[in-house]
């Protein structure tokens, strides 16, 4: 998430939220596509007895059980790669958090999977915001999240999913949002 420099007299504070268009998703989708294609072609080569790969000689593999197993893993990898490329294309999880003093509305918008709930939008009035809450959990699976506490709705997460953001950025962003909205920060 970006940390724009915003003075409190500006009417709109907006944070873009990075969804599935992260470098790590591009990396894994590419690696899995290449590996899955290789495995699928190796399995197909063992079935057709024609070498379809520039490296190695999968023709020497017996189709049952080696070729069919390699082909199955190739198909599974290609299906996973299609899923990853689709989520990247649809930008699942991407969106923005917008705090608008002019209209008095807080909008949290995220893109979802295609269908009925493709666009996920939560709107609330600024007076309904009770606090900005920070949750920090260190360890093997660290969690650093900023939540917006709303009356009657509970806590709504504002930060992206995936790599935890640095503590200084987390604290600065929470302080900026709390200052902009005129509410307290909880959890520090």
Curated annotation (Swiss-Prot):
GO terms for cellular component: photosystem I; plasma membrane-derived thylakoid membrane. It is found in: Cellular thylakoid membrane. The chain crosses the membrane at residues 28-48, 68-88. One of its GO terms (biological process) is photosynthesis. Signal peptide: none annotated. It is a multi-pass membrane protein. Keywords: Membrane, Photosynthesis, Thylakoid, Transmembrane, Transmembrane helix. It holds the Pfam family Ycf4. Seems to be required for the assembly of the photosystem I complex. Belongs to the Ycf4 family. PANTHER family: PHOTOSYSTEM I ASSEMBLY PROTEIN YCF4, PTHR33288. This is Photosystem I assembly protein Ycf4. It comes from Cyanothece sp. (strain PCC 7425 / ATCC 29141). The lineage of its organism: Bacteria, Bacillati, Cyanobacteriota, Cyanophyceae, Gomontiellales.
């Amino acid at each position: 998430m970006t940390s724009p420099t915003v003075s409190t007299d500006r009417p709109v504070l907006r944070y873009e939220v990075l969804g599935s268009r992260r470098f790590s998703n591009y990396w894994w989708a590419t690696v899995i596509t290449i590996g899955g294609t290789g495995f699928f072609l190796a399995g197909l080569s063992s079935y057709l007895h024609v070498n379809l790969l520039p490296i190695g000689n999968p023709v020497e593999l017996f189709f049952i059980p080696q070729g069919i197993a390699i082909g199955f893993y190739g198909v599974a990898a290609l299906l996973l790669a299609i899923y990853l490329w689709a989520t990247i294309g649809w930008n699942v999880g991407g969106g923005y958090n917008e705090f608008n003093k002019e209209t008095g509305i807080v909008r949290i918008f995220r893109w979802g999977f295609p269908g009925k709930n493709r666009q996920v939008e939560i709107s609330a009035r600024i007076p309904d915001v009770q606090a900005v809450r920070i949750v920090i959990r260190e360890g093997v699976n660290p969690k650093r999240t900023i939540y917006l506490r709303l009356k009657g709705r509970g806590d709504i997460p504002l930060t992206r999913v995936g790599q935890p953001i640095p503590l200084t950025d987390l604290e600065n962003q929470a302080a900026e949002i709390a200052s902009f909205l005129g509410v307290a920060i909880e959890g520090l």
